[in-house]
Amino acid sequence: MNTPAQKKITIVDTTLRDGMSSVSHQFTPQNVADIARGLDRAGVGTIEVAHGIGLGASSIQYGFAAATDPDYVRAAVDAVENADIAALYVPGIATLAELQKAIDAGIKTVRVAVHCTEADCGQQPVEWAKEQGLTVMTFLMMSHKLDPEPLAEQAAKLDSYGADVVYVVDSAGAMVPRHAGDRVAALRQAISADIGFHAHNNLGVGIANALTAAENGATFIDGSLRGLGASAGNAQTEVLAAAFERAGWDTGVDLFPLIDTAEHIVAPLMKEPQIVDETALILGYAGVYSTFFHPTKRAAKKFGVPARDILMELGRRGVIGGQEDMIIDVASELAGRTYEIPASAAV
């Protein structure tokens, strides 16, 4: 039973965006509708829908999706009664034209994601989206790479552009609770916008990180049903709901419909259990972007070198999202041979 003394937290679900990475972006529009309907019935207020990398990412580089982003968005919009549908926009991958298509399909919220040192790359899409009347959430990806104070300086830029929410994003699953709490606390001192936290579970502390982020001032927390997401996956939406309720927070969601949606709709669609295997663990330990998970496994098999060695070297080099081509470079170097592009693939 809710009381006025309860603290409020907003859970945003990303099963239909980050979770796409776990199913090779192959959810169908019907799958999207079924999952969105379940989340809506449970009271989730914002549901993120798109290709796993975001709008406009369906390609040979990131993997082709089973449908277009507008098709996914329309399927979700038609399935819900109360929830807002959101989409992810990554500058350099998406374009404003693609964002307009998502708006036409029915999104009410856009989530603009930039590398944690490059908040200025978000100015154009944030300001443009605000002009279109969208709620704008912003992501500082790979937030573990900056100490709290410089991260807060980047957040202040996004705040100045008009962002409604600024997220600390643990893209690599490299944080432990102290890291999450310190960064959120620094943002709370620096910006007037609301603060969000997006966890990955590579070190097994996604839920703990989310709880600590909330205790330090985050009011928006991302999750995905069954933890579905890149590499080790995200904080699990249904577990977040239960844990926050046990910790005395009002989530505004109904736990049992969340569990039902996770168990009876999402689980049968999963290719494999969302676990912290060796590659996922080392990815978090090395601080490498979560989408490197499957390409690294493929490169390890192709070149006959351990995935852990590839990831540790990538971490040492400080690679970020968008530098997936470095996986082949590192794997070939570790194997002691030069990789040549097949003639059939040459342009």
UniProtKB/Swiss-Prot annotation:
Catalytic EC class: lyase
Pfam families: DmpG_comm (PF07836), HMGL-like (PF00682)
Site (Transition state stabilizer): 17
Top-rank taxon: Bacteria
Transmembrane segments: none
Catalytic activity: (S)-4-hydroxy-2-oxopentanoate = acetaldehyde + pyruvate
Sorted UniProt keywords: Aromatic hydrocarbons catabolism, Lyase, Manganese, Metal-binding
PROSITE patterns for the chain: PYR_CT
InterPro entries: 2-IPM_HCS-like, 4OH_2_O-val_aldolase, Aldolase_TIM, DmpG_comm, DRE_TIM_HOA, PYR_CT
EC assignment: 4.1.3.39
Binding residues annotated for substrate, in chain numbering: 17-18, 171, 198, 289
Coiled coil (UniProt feature): none
GO biological process: catabolic process; L-leucine biosynthetic process
Domain Pyruvate carboxyltransferase intervals: 9-259
Annotated Gene3D superfamilies: 1.10.8.60, Aldolase class I (3.20.20.70)
HAMAP family: HOA
Family indicated by similarity: Belongs to the 4-hydroxy-2-oxovalerate aldolase family.
Protein name: 4-hydroxy-2-oxovalerate aldolase 2
Organism (species): Rhodococcus opacus (strain B4)
Organismal lineage: Bacteria, Bacillati, Actinomycetota, Actinomycetes, Mycobacteriales
